[in-house]
Amino acid sequence: MINKKLKSKSVLITAGAQGIGAAITKHFIDSGANVIIHYFSSEKAANELKNYAIEKGQKAIALKADLTKESQVNLLIEKAIEAFGGINILINNVGSLIARNSLDKMEENFWKKVMDVNLTSMMLVTRAATPFLVQNKNSSIVNLASLAGRKGGHAGSLAYATSKGAVLTFTRALSTELGEKGVRVNAVAPGLILGTAFHNTHTTKASAQKTIDGIPIQRAGNANDVARAVVYLASEYDGFITGATLDINGGVYNM
């Protein structure tokens, strides 16, 4: 999907070099945007996407950071502003199940780690980027939530589902707070998205097939399904949509 209204806009995508994040980054590049590609461990993929954008005549940088560390977040934003002069769009894509743990096996450190990766990092990046987002007209934020945040997730995803439910609330609350400053805030909640490290690591083939059998359109999603929705919400042509969550799950959850 090519969105000409994104041409020359500056977009920061966290975890923008693998899985859903890589698809999001590529869709923004193909729409003419300049991209700030954050990564933690996917340096090679990040640089490949950076070079892809540069070859198309656009600006791009790849920056490494641990987004659970405030100092590294602040440095990331500082480098982005130095390179691009501003940020128009923020995509908060960082997130992980980390491991499956039920309540009776839940350790405090594990719980805190999941919350730090999925929620605290989002707050830190958004807080650091917002002073620059508000300087540009029609800026927007898109947060990556999950169907697990809607329904509670599969067995062992208590901490993950809780954190993603909090992302939904964070999105609604922040849309109210930043609306008067001209920044829209929305989220997407993907369901089963195969071909990603998340499901390759944490979902068995049998579990995936069982889930697919319950999806009305009878297929799993893919990273491009999510990327198209993110680009839509981030763009200027839907300027009256804020505080919303777009469910991408083939009809499993349709409220």
Please state what every model-predicted region is.
Residues 2, 97, 231, 242-255:
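Short C-terminal tail/terminal secondary-structure segment
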Residues 47, 180, 190-215:
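A glycine/serine/threonine-rich, flexible loop-to-helix segment
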Residues 101-103, 107-115, 199, 211:
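Substrate-binding pocket helix/loop in short-chain dehydrogenase/reductase
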Residues 126, 163, 171:
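Active-site helix of classical SDR
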Residues 131, 176-177, 239:
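Alpha-helical segment proximal to the catalytic Tyr-Lys
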Residues 138, 179, 184, 241-243:
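Short, small/polar-rich loop/turn modules that mediate ligand/substrate recognition or access, typified
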Residues 146:
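Residue(s) in the substrate-gating loop at a strand-loop-helix junction
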